[in-house]
Amino acid sequence: ALVELLDLYPTLTELCGLKTTDDLQGKSLVPILEKPDQTVKEVAITQTPRPNYPRGKTPQIMGYSIRTEQYRYTEWRNFSNGDVKARDLYDHTYDPDEMTNLAKRRDKQSLIAGLAIKLEQTALKTKR
């Protein structure tokens, strides 16, 4: 199942029987604990700075990834202006170790376009 660190708080509060607010970004993972084949979300988002500077320094590039059950798509963006500098696409069904970047394959461009829109709407909070 796809999970994110922000799912930890709602999971722990539910397990402890505590109330939460409806505006939490995370989702409780209790349904997965009860039925491991169940899903609670269709995507997971990650963000990775490059280079990975210590606290207080500005990164040059930020990687924004969206992970589905099958794919991980990443846009490497200039931190200052948001321009996309590179893209990665990996098919975890056939390439779980992410050895072959599929982002430049013509037959994957439609998939990439859809994942890019979903990434913008979720991680970057814009509407297309």
Regions found by a protein language model. Give the residues of each.
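A short acidic/glycine-rich loop-to-helix N-cap element
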Residues: 100-106
